[in-house]
Amino acid sequence: MRKIILLTLITFCFSNTHAQDDIRSSSEKRAGFIDFYWSEKEGKIYLDIEKINEEFLYVNYLSAGVGSNDIGLDRGQIGNQRIVKFIRSGPKLLLIQPNYDFVAKSDNNEEIRSVEEAFAQSVLWGFYIEDERNGKLLIDLTDFLLSDVHGISQTLKQSGQGNYHIDPSRSAMYLPRTKNFKDNTDFESILTFTGTPEGGYIRSVTPTPEAVTVRVHHSFIRLPDDQYKPRKFDPRSGYYAMSYQDYASPIETSLTKRFIYRHRLEKKNPHASLSEPVKPIIYYVDKGAPEPVKSALIEGARWWNQAFEKAGYKNAFQVDVLPDSVDPLDINYNVIQWVHRSTRGWSYGSWIADPRTGEIIKGHVSLGSLRIRQDYLIATGLLQPFKNDSIPPEMLEMALARLRQLSAHEVGHTLGLYHNFAASADGRASVMDYPHPYIQLDINGEIDLSDAYDTGIGEWDEFTIKYGYSDFGPNQNEAHELKQIIDDWIEKGYHFITDSDARPKGGAHPLAHLWDNGKDPASELNRLIKVRKVVLDNFSMYAISRGEPISNIEEVLAPMYFMHRYQVEAAAKLIGGVDYAYKVRGDNLPLPKVISRDAQKAAIKSLTQTLNPEFLSIPKDLLKLLSPKAPGYWRTRESFKSKTGATFDPVTAAETSAEMTFSMIFNAQRMERVIQQHLTDKNQIGWSDILEPLYEATWESNYPDGLGKEIKMAVEKRLFFHLLDLSINDASSEAVKAMANREVENLISKITDKKANDSIIEAHYNHVIRLYSQFLSSPYDFKISQPLSPPDGSPIGMDCMN
């Protein structure tokens, strides 16, 4: 019996060894950073690990995406970036992610260990060791590579598209992009997610929406050496910050350490005022971008070399076309990728960085291909070009000018830079703002696009590159030099305000806006109102080409009719506004200051113009052209919404526009600031300074004839509904609720006393009174009417940093 058992064990061991020999001998070996074997017969990847406990960077990407902007699973999308290592426990290897958010930078090993053991780590996967020989451990990596590391199922679920799960029978390795290099080992897999589609987005982009097939790329990357020197973060510098908690910090210093994200760049000659770099920063443009797009992307990205020259470098920033042999996801290449979606959407400037230091290893830009078509559409609406067979060249030039700036903007993010949404107030001082085309009227009163978009890097951009990339000589004090750079831009009067202060509808900063122009938002709104009138008065069938359905005019009209929408947001922020900066103690930036009464009243006056029936009405001759959709065409998210079925609805268009103004004015945070500012200083505006001009433009003005009458009534109801909403909204302070209740009571009292000789006006008054009665009986159950949404606005041609 003992002999049988011994023979069985010998046979098993021999078979197991032979099996592993078969894996190595019968599989294709690919040597590189971490050697691996591809078994064609099994369809498996085996990783041959020589160094356990050695950290490396693990990144996943979506190499082939879904194609829906709303879902967000785009080609080239970067997933999680993690420092990981393999550790052994008996017959298993664990892929573990240490916790670099909490560390101890210390020579005391016990102090380091105490922090490591205080906070959780993450084991990403466990592998059984298939074979051990010559100091190498063989593991089967396949299941890991075919797992949902990118969180695709979760994204589909969160976007309302249904519950999807990986189907292993329809998933496999993708060999054309599974490669090995000296410093990175890359794998790619085909993943098929099966489920029942619940949303329209996934149906619109997938041939069989029950099976969504994408490709995921995995990169194991050698960590950079220790020669990179992190640069201190300053909130005024314009850079994104990386941070961690250092528990070995002296008690008198901050626990949190902050550094900027930036590429490694050094001068060959640090003593020279202008020197070539040791290694330039090179970006490569996707060959999939067609001409003239590709040339525009290259030209715009190359603008950054101007800023690097100001920082003391010669040819430090270069842009070329991506070679055929290079994978755009290869960690060794900074890439500007051309990404297609079914609808226009955001572009992204992302990076892969060393989580320990903030050193950017790879910049990766994703540019939405439909952006240029949106700018071309805007130019079409402005110029009405199809009267003759020849197309004005300024249309394409405007679109390409925007694309150059977009390329520069997104590359700026990958250099580590924040948005600067105050730059437009400083004479378009940065490509890191969101630019609205600057549309002018020439001396003949005709549209002039000659200065629609700026060219080149701005002055603010030069300051930021100096801060992030200057290589200071041995006789220079870095802290002093960095302070001097910031003091310089402060002295020159530039402004820096970023996303957290510019994006919220309740934002208070007078200069931090998206898609605006000029130093004074109210004055620019007045100017844009005049431009809009010229555009609408001249709008005709020449907005579409000969042979195109006349019903397509609607989509060209939409961005013209709502041309003012972003400047309305900018002007509204003056109400209850506060001018402030990211000041630190000891600098010359100003302390916060409430916007003057005159500036706030000017904003209210400008905004009130956008509520007049004359402003909101579409010219009669143009209205005659707006036709129901032709067969084979249909309304899209770029179209006006309608309450009249197939026909164009000018009243709903007007109501939608008015809602843009009211929703900004009656923001609960804004109205509370108005109360506080007025209580602090009686010279500041109060609620009456806002409501009286609005009443004069609506309930207290005469009703025009024709459609203007119903437009005015629709606007009046929006005002009424906003007051109701403020009175019960959880976001409203108690003071705002009280003031809103007071205003709506006074309004109802005035309406009750009004007499109307017109049946529709009388019905309008009675309806509002009846609605208020219903509201009083059950305010929190009362359903406040919501207007139909406008056609898509943002992005005109911009991004969202990941």
Model-derived regions, located:
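Soluble non-cytosolic domains of exported or imported proteins
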Residues: 77, 287, 291-299, 397-406, ...
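The catalytic-center signature of Zn2+-dependent metalloproteases
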Residues: 321-340, 401-457
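Conserved catalytic/binding loops enriched for acidic/polar residues
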Residues: 426-802
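Sec-dependent N-terminal signal peptides
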Residues: 4-13
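Zn2+-dependent metallopeptidase catalytic core
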Residues: 54, 291-316
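Sec-exported extracytoplasmic/periplasmic mature domains
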Residues: 302-313, 412-413, 417, 437, ...
